[in-house]
């Protein structure tokens, strides 16, 4: 991905200055897509003076699903504690370890070799921590065998078409750039608080894997590159904060969807979830989940992970989607909560009438209509 990392000659012994320079230029394609001017001068000015003192360490990734959002967030957090200039390199592509999105989109898979390049007062400590993280599978439990899936019985309920509240986004702003930037920062802060609440909710229910998902979302949203890209759009387009943020996160979502790794590809819905939550705060749109009094099957094109965590499994018996992915965090959360999940049903889903009784067969990924 041109927007993620430049092709560099690090593996063949190139100067570290060249490695860093090329990696910093990896953002040029994204800047052009967003209509921003070239940042060549800016990159040259911000490039640290790397030399032969830089150290590196390569590890082989043993996480079954590679470095997806959760282990990547652990890596970002750990390396952020060291006073050193660092790059991560895989197959000649480099990204900064400050950005969970760049790491995730680097598509580091099982058995891939990942190298950390570091220079600075705590470079050695960073390399040691990197090696320890790899040995610990970046905080994930190594599965020696596939988990035994519990049989999921068919679930039934009345059909309810669900869609999140629509946020109206205006492009033209009547405020100053500084005022729009402050609006965006506040909305991001409110969304980060939302994510902390969701993490605590999952932890209180003993759902540690789900808590880790929303902790990863917190790290994903707190990526300084996202705010920087939106701030530049505000400067050059004189647009609203919601318009700038929508452009940046939609582009990121599309990058995830274009990956050839199905597991990482499914993470686009997480980005869409974060965008939606931030837009709700920016536009001050009121959003409340519907309440149900009888067994219900939710029908939708797709559904956000944060929405599912807030559902009551005692009433919402199943979720049936026209799109979606069985590898998404939404699917994982539904399964953990005991909510039936079938997806990729296509247009036939929309032939169902509201309040019609449905039965979902999770095992066969099919639904049946009463009568």
Which ranges hold each PLM region?
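Non-catalytic, soluble scaffold/interaction modules
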Residues: 56-58, 65, 70, 77-80, ...
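A short pocket-lining beta-strand/turn micro-motif at the edge of beta-sheets
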Residues: 2-4, 84, 112
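Short amphipathic beta-strand starts and helix->beta connectors
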Residues: 94-103
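Glycine-rich, charged/polar anion/phosphate-binding loops
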Residues: 1, 38, 42-47, 70, ...
